[in-house]
Regions:
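Nucleic-acid-processing active sites and adjacent nucleic-acid-binding tracks
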Residues: 113-183
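Acidic, metal-ligating active-site segments
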Residues: 103-119, 281-290
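Metal-dependent DNA phosphodiester-chemistry modules and their immediately adjacent helices/loops
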Residues: 1-17, 207-301
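Beta-sheet entry/capping signal
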Residues: 1-3, 92-96, 106-108, 123-126, ...
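An acidic- and aromatic-residue-enriched active-site/binding cleft used to recognize and process polar
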Residues: 99-103, 114, 188-193, 221-226
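Conserved helicase motor "Helicase C" RecA-like lobe of SF1/SF2 P-loop NTPases
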Residues: 193-213
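Short glycine-rich phosphate-binding loop at a beta-alpha junction
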Residues: 180-197
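Non-catalytic, compositionally simple segments
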Residues: 1-95, 104-106, 124, 128-131, ...
Length: 303
């Protein structure tokens, strides 16, 4: 609906019976305390209240949805490199965005390498990603032939079974770290599973990083317009600038992913969305998380 009545909104936010109907795993995987904490936090901000109602209860308010960046604009920015070519010794810092979607979505880690170019006085950016799809989701996907092609070519990873195992994500990060990739901040959606984030924190501490610093390296990024709007505008500026400030890896999925990404505009704010269930934008969500972390590191965002 475009709007919901105040009493309906309050029922969603307070009724434990409604929660149980929406989430049968309540009390098993997800606890009431999680809902209570998210709702208490959201009541302080109208945008966050919209996000909580959308994500926790599957009730959506609609805004104006428009296309964003087409794949044809991304292809000229792609180069024959991967994130492992962007090392600390060459001055590159890497921001990581993680979208641990479930079901038939992709399980994605996006990387954004950033370096200051002393000759031009500008920042340089490079984006790459790792993504997985569940075998069960692949078998039912309208995009199966396309996904199978990318899997065969090594661009998309296949995860057996019906459940994502977050060890795959940690293994990917470990491999990047061992190859000299300097990952400085990790953005994630706090409305998704906390297990991968707990594993991430444990791995960072195993590297000898103090627990307090680990907490500052792992940054929650909510997928609502208030958080995404600055990152969307920045990324759009980088991509559409006459000079090539940002490049993308040679992964052929990039143009398809960007074409899937639509923008919902409401109250002069923008957030990422998609047109059809089979459209995948998880990697782009991760890229926005990377941009958010970059701004956070540079003091442009306060949490």
């Amino acid at each position: 609906p475009d709007e919901w009545e105040a009493q309906d909104e309050e029922l969603l936010l307070t009724s434990k019976d409604v929660r149980r109907k929406i989430n049968p795993m309540l009390g098993i995987i997800v606890q009431h305390a999680f809902y209570d904490d998210e709702i208490a936090h959201a009541r302080q901000n109208p945008e966050e209240k919209i996000e909580v109602i959308s994500k926790l209860f599957n009730v959506y308010q609609s805004g104006k949805v428009t296309s964003w960046i087409k794949g044809d604009r991304i292809r000229p920015l792609q180069i024959d490199r991967r994130i492992t070519d962007y090392k600390y010794e060459d001055g590159w810092d890497v921001f990581v965005g993680m979208d641990f979607s479930g079901g038939d979505d992709l399980f994605a880690i996006t990387y954004l390498a950033v370096r200051y170019n002393q000759e031009t006085g500008n920042k340089e950016f490079f984006a790459d990603f790792d993504a997985w799809i569940l075998e069960a989701a692949l078998n039912e996907s309208p995009n199966r032939l396309l996904f199978e092609k990318w899997i065969a070519e090594g661009w998309l990873h296949l995860m057996p079974g019906e459940v994502f195992y977050n060890e795959h994500a940690i293994d990917a990060l470990i491999a990047k770290n061992e190859q000299g990739v300097n990952m400085v901040l990790f953005g994630y959606d706090p409305a998704q599973s906390v297990d991968p984030i707990n594993n991430l924190k444990a791995w960072l501490q195993s590297l000898g990083i103090e627990a307090k610093r680990v907490l500052s390296m792992v940054v929650p990024v909510r997928q609502h317009a208030l958080a995404q709007n600055p990152s969307i505008l920045e990324l759009e500026t980088l991509i559409k600038a006459p000079e090539q400030f940002i490049h993308f890896s040679c992964n052929p999925m990039w143009p398809w992913l960007f074409t899937n990404a639509l923008i919902e505009r409401k109250n002069d704010l923008r957030r990422l969305t998609k047109g059809k269930p089979q459209d995948k934008i998880d990697v782009i969500h991760g890229l926005l998380d990377c941009m958010y972390c970059f701004d956070f590191a540079n003091g442009n965002i306060q949490q």
